[in-house]
Amino acid sequence: MGAALSDTNYAVIYDLHSHTTASDGLLTPETLVHRAVEMRVGTLAITDHDTTAAIPAAREEISRSGLALNLIPGVEISTVWENHEIHIVGLNIDIAHPAMRDFLAQQTERRQARGRLIAERLEKAHIPGAWEGALRLANGGAVTRGHFARFLVECGKAATMADVFKKYLARGKTGYVPPQWCTIEQAIDVIHHSGGKAVLAHPGRYDLSAKWLKRLVAHFADHHGDAMEVAQCQQSPNERTQLATLARQHHLWASLGSDFHQPCPWIELGRKLWLPAGVEGVWQTWEQPQISQ
């Protein structure tokens, strides 16, 4: 997968982490799948936050337009571990499975409750209208902290989304509300019940020391997690190698994904997504041909 690409002959690019307007992405499902093809992605997973609402529209557009794109139904589930918000991606799930549907309905209720509390805290800090602003920006999708961040940038409270999180939404700041999500174990369980593979999302992005990151990966593996994201767009070669080593040590499959939310200079669908030597791609768990009995 690390081989150079040419116009006529190139390896399949996998991007197994992306977002749409169903959560905090800026592209509709239809636009996202077309962009994926433009970026030469061959297999794309849509993994919106605690919702699978984008999958049917994406499937329909791929079929309608005859796109050469393999769509993997997915979801990114918010969990809490040791007072840290940790995201678990479910890949190749059955989005119609009753267990998954019921579970995501509960997650939506938790997300709405947290959003209202964030808005209340911002209101007390003399920033009115945050809930209405976040709802407007979500446009019918799940309300996330990203929508509050966009609202605050819109209001001139900060120059960038990153600045908003540092100033208002990070732990200890005005708009921070401790998450009340499910556990990692519960997320893994519902993903498995719906026929999918559980993946520890962007492990290098959490505010954890090397020691605590090792504890997180061990906890995830001990509770039957399947894979961890090893490769992302923005990442030092050293981090990619270290994550691959952790995956091997805990006998986890490797995943990779851009975590694409919107077109920007530094994150793009399929960009720099290759696995180091010594790890195996999680897609092999569903692409391997079945042996006939």
Swiss-Prot record:
One of its GO terms (molecular function) is 5'-3' DNA exonuclease activity. CDD domains: PHP_HisPPase_AMP. SUPFAM superfamilies: PHP domain-like. One of its GO terms (biological process) is rRNA processing. InterPro entries: PHP_dom, PHP_domain, Pol/His_phosphatase_N, Pol/histidinol_Pase-like. Keywords: Exonuclease, Hydrolase, Manganese, Metal-binding, Nuclease, Nucleotide-binding, rRNA processing. Disulfide bonds: none annotated. Exoribonuclease that catalyzes the last steps of 5S, 16S and 23S rRNA 5'-end maturation. Removes 3 nucleotides (nt) from the 5' end of 5S, 16S and 23S rRNA precursors to generate the mature 5' ends. 5S and 23S rRNA maturation occurs more efficiently and accurately on ribosomal particles as compared to free RNA. Efficiently catalyzes the hydrolysis of the 3'-phosphate from 3',5'-bis-phosphonucleotides as well as the successive hydrolysis of 5'-phosphomononucleotides from the 5'-end of short pieces of RNA and DNA, with no specificity toward the identity of the nucleotide base. It comes from the Bacteria. NCBIfam families: RNaseRnm (NF047791). Mn(2+) 3 binds at residues 76, 87, 202. Its cofactor is Mn(2+). Mn(2+) 1 binds at residues 17, 19, 76, 259. It is an enzyme of class 3 (hydrolase). It catalyses: a ribonucleoside 3',5'-bisphosphate + H2O = a ribonucleoside 5'-phosphate + phosphate. The gene is rnm. Belongs to the PHP family. TrpH/YciV subfamily. Mn(2+) 2 binds at residues 24, 49, 261. Its EC number is 3.1.13.-, 3.1.3.97. This is 5'-3' exoribonuclease Rnm. It comes from Salmonella typhimurium (strain LT2 / SGSC1412 / ATCC 700720).
